[in-house]
Amino acid sequence: MKYHDNTSFASDSIGIDIDLKKLKFLIPEIFSPIQEIKYKFKKWGFSTHIEVISEHVKYGDSQGAIVVKTNPLLIAAYNEDIDCIVMLVFEDKIQNKYNFKIQDRLVCVNTFAEISQLQSDLIPGKNNSGMWTLVHPIIADLVSSDATKIEKRKNEIGDKGYEYIWQLATDYLKLKKGVSRIGKPIFSDQVIPQYF
């Protein structure tokens, strides 16, 4: 991998590809003319946000995510390593396009890092591995059209998995009321609280 840690590997990578149209709708600011030119010439070493996101969703660890609210659109993205959710908030245009319902099942792809202390918005669960202190979730359904792989992963997570994520999300709303991260992929690793 060019942008992510080669010394650790995701146990549940689903190898999805990005859909540039979906990604552009979600985060148009990374599609400036210069960024698009760099992306076309990536094999010569040019780095772009598009390429970083592409690698993230192809090789990262896939887990369940669930729609918590629709106004504003809140999606809880689960990660197994810290055994917690990250609450992501999205612009109204995302809800208008996809017309999500509360408890709709999605898939997120996570990458991790170790920083000096656990990110302040995380509530580590009893199965926290203790390996990581930063999680970077991206909602697969919003950046990829690999529907077969995404649906297969949803089926693997199953009812029990999504029920667990829903419970974590419900608990989170009580303990971290009104706190979420920006859902756009280039910001979703950062604790920049968005209050709803």
Give the role of each language-model region:
Residues 93-113:
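Short nucleic-acid-contacting surface segments enriched for D/E, G, S/T with interspersed K/R
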Residues 1-45, 190-196:
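N-terminal intrinsically disordered, low-complexity, charge/repeat-rich segments that act as generic
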Residues 27, 31-34, 116-124:
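Internal, charge-rich low-complexity segments
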Residues 41-63:
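Short boundary/loop segments of OB/S1/cold-shock single-stranded nucleic-acid-binding domains
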Residues 68-91:
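OB-fold (S1/OB) nucleic-acid-binding surfaces
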Residues 118-196:
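Cytosol-/stroma-facing membrane-proximal "stalk/adaptor" domains immediately downstream
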Residues 55-73, 107:
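Structural detector for short beta-strands of small beta-barrel domains
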